[in-house]
Amino acid sequence: MLRILLIDDTPRKIGRLKSALIEAGFEVIDESGLTIDLPERVEAIRPDVVLIDTDSPGRDVLEQVVLVSRDQPRPIVMFTDDSDPDAMRQAIRAGVSAYIVEGIQAQRLKPILDVAMARFESDQAIRAQLQAREQQLAERKRIELAKGM
């Protein structure tokens, strides 16, 4: 069972979303508004997935997503009413694994979270490969530099 940290910008919506998650068989281990220190909360409770529900992802939220993605990588799913392509791009660049526009339905939650998990795992594998290649290149440069001396 996936353990979910639920972040929402309105208490009214948090209740609906929490109910839908529980109905879909997920465990909501913590819930909060958008004004928290997200990296600190993620470190403290170690959720499997962070789910953010917001009318429109603001700069502060995206900055916190960047910090979580960099320091404590895990799938982040964002439900929003903002269908602006620039907002989508910014969220994906920040580290959001799935950006879902217009509505949350209990029957859609499991497939959405499954896709987010798969995308996150794929992204992590690509990042690991890139890091390994960068290390190999740095080692080759050191060897070539040593040969030239």
PLM feature segments, named:
Residues 20, 109-121:
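Receiver (REC) domain switch/output surface
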Residues 128-149:
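C-terminal output/effector regions of signal-responsive regulators
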Residues 1-13, 17-21, 50:
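Conserved acidic segment of CheY-like receiver
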Residues 86, 104-113:
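C-terminal output helix
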Residues 14, 34-39, 48-68:
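Conserved phosphotransfer microenvironments
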Residues 73-83:
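A short, hydrophobic beta-strand element within the central beta-sheet of small alpha/beta folds
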Residues 25-34:
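Short hydrophobic/Thr-rich beta-strand motif most characteristic of the beta2 strand and flanking loop
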